[in-house]
A protein has these predicted regions:
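Conserved phosphate- and dinucleotide-binding cores of soluble alpha/beta proteins
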Residues: 1-23, 27-55, 59-323
């Protein structure tokens, strides 16, 4: 997860200059948040990326807030145990006259559509085309706001560097809008090729397709559709899907980072080399990242007590997270 976080920060956040973003909940995004003050700082990116967040007050954001990375967070809702820390940082959180945080789920969803440069979240399965879902035969997990956060709002006209750069990298943009320029929201899925329990992350067909049939649903429970997804980050590397000219090239890019899964077994090494030369696939070495440096030493906080210390004793973790 730390290696994936390093690749994401250098190969996506830094490359596109992402200023406004939303993170899903999970270990992958927590790893990114926790290495901003260390690895991100070593790249000289503070003040250049990750300044404004549409995000619940994640405890793993405390080190980034305390080191001046996150300038403000506007939240969908709160987080148990963060009340006193939030109250002490009215410069970062939206605090009302009574000293408590003002959150608004609807405003956050709108901001996710039209203000955020990027959505980053974890997923359980990605199929050979790039469709993503957390609904599997072993675990039907809800999507939360991911379908809203993880889609490209066609009504957006607010230009930012990251949005504009991504849109101008879309391979078939001239076929879609002719001479007119358009941006595109960065939609990033982070995944492990094989989970700790042995379940493959990359599959030929989503379990969601069979779930639709079994449950008599009108639509497969797909969390993020392939045409909205711009990047996939696995421990193998990054696939820049929006740069692909057609579905076949997209499928080859996915195979290149799918590891020892049924999708990854179909990888063509010669095609992967071509995609790397084109900048459509990037491995850690392409990004100048030494895999051996991806260690827990990069985490600004290595346990819950560290987070409490970073907060000046204001974060009060729920009992189940204490040890």
């Amino acid at each position: 997860r730390i290696l994936k976080a390093m690749m994401a920060i250098k190969g996506i956040y830094g490359e596109y200059g992402v200023q406004v973003l939303n993170h899903g909940v999970g270990f992958d995004t927590s790893a990114i948040e926790l290495i901003l003050p260390t690895y991100g700082e070593s790249l000289g990116l503070r003040g250049k990326i990750c300044r404004h967040w549409v995000l619940n007050p994640h405890p793993t954001m405390i080190p980034a807030i305390e080191t001046g990375w996150a300038e403000n967070l506007y939240s969908f809702g709160s987080e148990v145990g963060m009340e006193e820390y939030i109250k002490a940082r009215p410069d970062v959180f939206a605090i009302g006259p009574d000293g408590t945080m003002r959150s608004n789920r609807a405003f956050c969803q709108a901001a996710g559509h039209y203000a955020a440069d990027m959505f980053v979240g974890s997923t359980m399965q990605i199929d050979r085309y790039g469709n993503s879902s957390t609904a599997t035969k072993n675990n039907v997990a809800g999507f939360g706001g991911a379908p809203n956060m993880g889609c490209d709002a066609k009504g957006r006209r607010h230009v930012t560097e990251a949005w504009f750069k991504c849109g101008n990298e879309v391979a078939n943009r001239a076929e879609l809008t002719g001479e007119c320029l358009r941006g595109k929201k960065l939609v990033v899925q982070v995944i492990t090729t094989i989970s700790e329990k042995g379940f493959p992350g990359f599959v030929q067909e989503l379990d969601a397709i069979q779930l639709k049939k079994n449950a008599g649903l009108d639509l497969e429970p797909v969390m993020i559709y392939s045409d909205d997804l711009t990047h996939i980050v696995s421990e193998i590397g990054i696939a820049y899907l929006h740069k692909c000219c057609n579905m076949e090239e997209r499928m080859n890019a996915i195979r290149a980072i799918a590891g020892k899964t049924e999708v990854g077994m179909l990888e063509d090494p010669a095609e992967t080399l071509r995609l790397r030369k084109e900048g459509i696939v990037k491995l850690p070495e392409d990004l100048g990242i030494d895999r051996s440096t991806a260690t827990r030493e990069l985490l600004a906080a290595k346990n819950m007590k560290d987070l409490v210390d970073w907060s000046g004793g204001l974060y009060n973790p729920p009992a189940k997270f204490r040890n």
